[in-house]
UniProtKB/Swiss-Prot annotation:
Biased composition (Basic residues): 7-20
GO terms for cellular component: large ribosomal subunit
Disordered: annotated segments: 1-20
Record family assignment: Belongs to the bacterial ribosomal protein bL32 family.
Highest taxon of source: Bacteria
Keywords carried by this UniProt record: Ribonucleoprotein, Ribosomal protein
GO biological process, one term: translation
Protein name: Large ribosomal subunit protein bL32
Gene Ontology molecular function: structural constituent of ribosome
Gene that specifies this protein: rpmF
Length: 62
């Protein structure tokens, strides 16, 4: 089984992982609902690209 010849120090390990970061989610202002929402997603009110694509009139009972 292969093992490292030298112990990897904290500095070496952290500098290697320094470029790994969380990205900011892509959000934009939706003029139809007047709220910010994630890009390429349907708004909570059911609008996408200015059109209503999901009907939210039902109360969740099937």
């Amino acid at each position: 089984m292969a093992v490292p010849a030298r112990h990897t120090s904290k500095q070496k390990k952290r500098s290697r992982r320094g470029h790994i970061k969380l990205s900011v989610p892509a959000m934009h202002y939706d003029a139809t609902t007047g709220e910010y929402r994630l890009s390429h997603r349907v708004s909570p009110k059911g609008y996408y690209k200015g059109r209503q694509v999901v009907n939210n009139n039902d109360n969740g009972n099937n």
